Amino acid sequence: PTENGTIYYKQELEAISHVCHECGMPLFLDGARLGYGLMAADNDVTLEDIARLCDVFYIGGTKVGALFGEAVVITNPVISKDFRYMIKQRGGMLAKGRLLGIQFQTLFEDGLYWQISRHAIDMAMKLKKAFQACGYGFYVENSTNQQLPVLPDAVLEKLAGKYSYSFWEKTDESHS
């Protein structure tokens, strides 16, 4: 998903990939929230599509419970040439990289990565319904776990006394 929870559909990703490759530019997909995008109810993109259309992408780990890191996937052989040595020479390779790998091996065993992602979306949809039942709208409609309700500033002030939350932006004079 994007920063506001919307997703790219297959046709959009294909068009972006086409333009990038036509212009000789590699396409990188930031996969920090990849599981949530791929498990969204209206998603039509598969992991295989991403691997086919992108030159480099990563599979985010921390947002689905990993202690740290992302798994970088390089599908373009030109980019992958000597990649391992470049990151090692620049201090980007962990001496004990297997610790990172074990997390992803575990996350992808028995579909755990997808289960965690689906569960997060299901919980976000419950929150969304509760906000809607109270008459609140959302910054943007989406089907991922990133639900951004727009609330009256007075309500936010009351919430700030009891809860921690992130402020996105003001949507008008009295709502955020």
What are these regions (language model features)?
Residues 125-176:
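Conserved C-terminal alpha-helix-loop-beta "cap" of PLP-dependent enzymes
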Residues 27-31, 57-60, 140, 167-169:
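General beta-strand structural signal in soluble alpha/beta enzymes
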Residues 1-31:
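Active-site phosphate-binding strand-loop segment of PLP-dependent enzymes
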Residues 33-35, 63:
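Active-site-proximal loop/turn and secondary-structure-junction residues that shape catalytic pockets
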Residues 1-8, 40, 44-146:
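Active-site C-terminal subdomain of aminotransferase-like
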Residues 15-19, 119, 130, 158:
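Alpha-helical scaffold elements within enzyme catalytic domains, especially in hydrolases
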